[in-house]
Amino acid sequence: MSPSAFRSRSNIRSRSYTTNDLKFTFIYIMMMVSCLSQNVHNLQSDSDLSDTKLSGAVDLANKIYKNTGANKNNKNITVNASNLDLETANLNFNLSTSIVSNCSFGTTYSDYVNISQQIIFIYNYLEENKTTAVRVTVKSSNATEAFPTMFVARQQEGILSWQIPFEIGSSYSFWSVSRTLCPIDKSKKKTISKSQLIYITVSSMWEHNVHFTLTTNRVTDFELEHDKPRTFHLSVWQPTYFMYTFPENVSTILLKVTSASHICMTVSVQNIKCPVFDLETNVEFEGKHQTMTTQAAMFLEKDDFKEMNGFYVVFIVKPSNEVCEGYLQQTVIGPSNETDSKKTVTVEIKGTISGSQYLSAILGAIGFYLIFYVIAFIIGIVFAGCGLHKGLDELTQEEIGNERRSISSQPNESYGSICASTESSGDNILSPATSMNQIECSNSSDSLDESSIDFLHDASIEKEIVRTKTALFVSDLARKKRKKLAKSYRLYHWNLITIAIFYGLPVVQLVITYQRVLTSTGNQDLCYYNFACSHPLENYLSSFNNVFSNIGYIMLGLLFIVIVYRRDVLHKKILRKHGKLEKLYGIPQHFGLFYAMGLALFMEGIMSACYHVCPNYTNFQFDTSFMYIIACLNMLKIYQSRHPDINAKAHTAYFSMAVIIFIAVLGVVYGTNIFWILYALIHMLVTLVLTAQVYYMGRWNIDCNIFRRIWRLVITEGRKCTNPVYPSRFTLLLIGNIINWVFALYGAIKQPSDFATYLLAIFIGNLLLYCIFYIIMKLLYKEHLNWLVKIVICTSVITWAGSLYFFFQNLTSWSETPAGSRSGNRECILLDFYDHHDVWHFLSAISLFFSFMILLLLDDDLSHVRRDKIPVF
């Protein structure tokens, strides 16, 4: 079909050009000449375009321009592009430009273009006081990637171009596109013309006719209103954006986007300026943005948009759910099924809390924890003044005199009660050489310290006698010199201080860097906040409430250290006053582990706050590391209470904790099938080793003959398993082994995605089991719990139940994608400032504090009971 025949089909075309239009034609011809100079080999077969031919084309363009200039007074000049004598330039090319003027908004235009036929659509409208936008929707069903259909929209202040097929990446192509032209902001309406023109040029480089349709609409509801939800539809080929202007009395707002569809999309907030970055390929270059499936939210401040007092909200549907769901769903949406990707979205903008509410929430949290200081002070006065805590000071003078006479009348014995027990025992346990040395009890128990015990040549054999007795008492395992043990236990908190400094400082530096990157890039997928309740602190913290809610760990950790220090001071007074008498009564008091527990609680607050500066997949171990340490220290403290001489050294304990943290990191980063199998095997093996260590009180060795000894033990004493020598220890260890083996097998089979939480659950489960066992054994041995301990236990149980309820609300999850995590976001529930996870912080801090207090107060009823009457279990 010839160009003239093609034009004759249309009765809406005008061939009347204005002077300005002919100037544009001149520019367009020059552009075509430039293109022809590069692609002329497709049009002619003899040789390249010569200088003579190029100059001829340029002369032709100048001639057209001069002819139009000679008739400037004429408002309309008729020029037929197809009749231009292009042969003058020796070019085998005819270009026909058709104009469709006075186009109507809302009307669909359908036509064809090819290499020699282009069409210009002209829209004319009057700008009003209200900001409006123009949306252009085009479709070209038979366009190809080799010969796309090109669209160019020109306005007074900018130009926008795109093509069909509309390609996103290398896998997705679309034959329908809807684009919003950058609107003229109402602040500029005084400096621009009221009458606005839009030129939309449609062209193609294909020799065959390419069909297209074009529809242009004015978006009259382009501005979003405050506190009024807006529901609309969009799709992959239809990116959309709206404008919002801050009201005069609003300084901060919450932008909330919701959808029932799980189709992946991006929400972006950008400054009001052209061009608007509304494509999948460029949306990340401007403003703040986050991915979403069912919901998204952004906290925005007016001060961040001072220039225009508002912003654009851009919505872009992604072609696949790979980013949001974590799997790849490749789908090429063609002209027949573009509606398959439609997504219905509701956007709402509402105000946030004021600065006074910020202050009330902060002071309220601090005041709440100060109440614990007041209660602790009152209880301290009651215990000290009313004599509720009976210790050595409460013994009568007659009792003190009897005990001192008993001490002075005792014969010199080696290892305290060992000689007496061996003399009364008729069992010939020791070898003759050992018995001779053993009978020579030349030193009193007071003269024996850590070095004298550990370095005697028969010390190992004597430990075998003591620690393998069927009925053990605390006096049997509290024989090392107190000063040396105290120095050893003090290493726990001093080493922990060093660990905290060297571990904490790089963490602080890293999270500050995270915050700066988040602020500078605007990529809010970096951090897993609860965006529906995320209150920033200027540009320093994006979620200040999640950071500040850790104040409970810090304040209660310090309070626990103060309480321990007070008990330490009182105990030292008793030592100075009663001397050797203290060594006969109560559980041995060593406060090093208690100080370490308080410090660990304090550091948990610091590290959890650091994690919540930018919570994500790479730094979750910041939050859990000191949780592991707290669990380990609590179990060590329970064991130390009645096994003071055989507890783990500080460096050994912390090295074991470091190995645990290392395993946690491996599980998070490399959670493969091989890892889970190896972890399960290691877990079960370590459980067996610790079982033997606890059951035999450390009196066994791992060497090349270990398996031979185990086999002999099974052969000779296998039947005795139904009647174990140490029934209480056997029961605890049996239950512990069952629970730990279940944990290990569950991990290997189910392979939970959150390995760090899984590992933490193992430690909490073991700690809970040990605490329950210890309390039950106290009651079985007729030991009493005073009223304060009962209150603390009940309070701890209640707060732990509440804590776990809020913990499992799953507001966020770093094990999922950012969009998947964001789907669980919920609004604030406390003072319009704190969310469920903040309440977890509050309650878990209280729970840990009361758990520590249980261990501190649990054996106070034994302070006036002789150690040789306190059983070991």
Residue map of PLM features:
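Intrinsically disordered, low-complexity polyampholyte segments enriched for Lys and acidic residues
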Residues: N11, N20-K23, K72
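Cleavable N-terminal signal peptides of Sec/SRP-targeted secreted and luminal proteins
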Residues: D21-S37
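Boundary at the C-terminal end of the N-terminal hydrophobic targeting segment
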Residues: C35-S37, N42-S45
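Long, hydrophobic alpha-helical transmembrane bundles and adjoining juxtamembrane helices/loops
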Residues: S96, F105-Y109, Q118, Y123, ...
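N-terminal secretory signal peptides that target proteins for export/translocation
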Residues: M1-Y17
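Non-catalytic, beta-strand-enriched accessory regions in extracellular/secretory proteins
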Residues: D46, D51-G69, N74-F305, G310-Y312, ...
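Residues marking helix boundaries in flexible regions
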Residues: R13, Y28-M30, T78
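Ala/Thr-enriched low-complexity intrinsically disordered regions
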Residues: A5, T18-T19, T25, T52, ...
